């Protein structure tokens, strides 16, 4: 399956909703609550980030970047036009395919460390101003 389908439906319009001139979007993954943890547990263990980002890279390489641009982008146009009942503009996806990589920078805490609740474990930011929209577009997958 095309990796760009692995998002929440409403995020397919985010690229049009950011304020004009947006160039950078910085996002984080933070454990927000310990309400289901045993009483007195106020930390979580950081783990899995290396696997997730390696998987993300490999998945997009195999299911988007290594496939013909017309094939993957026309599939996106067809499905998203039906889903949104409009003639969906895929220019931003075509430009991403031309780039041939996900333009993001990821930072994470070391795996295995205990992290207090409400402390970010992972941050993600776009590395190309043109692709400010990709940061939160990928959030669902992460």
PLM segments and residue spans:
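Ordered alpha/beta subdomains of enzyme catalytic regions
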Residues: 1-142
